[in-house]
Amino acid sequence: MRLISWNVNSLRAREPLLEKLVLTEKPDILCLQELKILDKDYVESFFNKFSLKTLSETQKSYNGVSISCKEDINLKEIPLKKLNLIQARNNTIILEDLKLVIINCYFPNGNPIDSEKFINKIEWMKTLFKEIKSLKDDYEILLLSLIHI
């Protein structure tokens, strides 16, 4: 299985590169961060050209994530919506056949350290790791992200 993760930093700005990547590398699963686009239909129609089904959490101007995969991959979305802060987005899927959970997220930026943004980031991360621990033990977990360290 070929899985690619990319902080695309604007889907529209990187469309030609993304098209080339998909056509050349032929990923089974493609996880993008920082889509910087509000229109979910646009994201899904872009990937439909390549016969990739797509789940996306979008937000205008910044953030946003998507998971796209080949049509024959059996996936189930896990809603971790309580993790969505203003600056954070996530998609989480289970690939039942592979016993694999993929979490693709955009961590909130916590700068500066002595700010409420930093406290919110730490709380968001604690919630994320609690959610991960609550998943089935017989699944492998793959966390893909723009973390903002």
Locations of the language-model features?
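Surface-exposed cleft-lining segments at the edges of enzyme active sites
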Residues: 81-83, 107-128
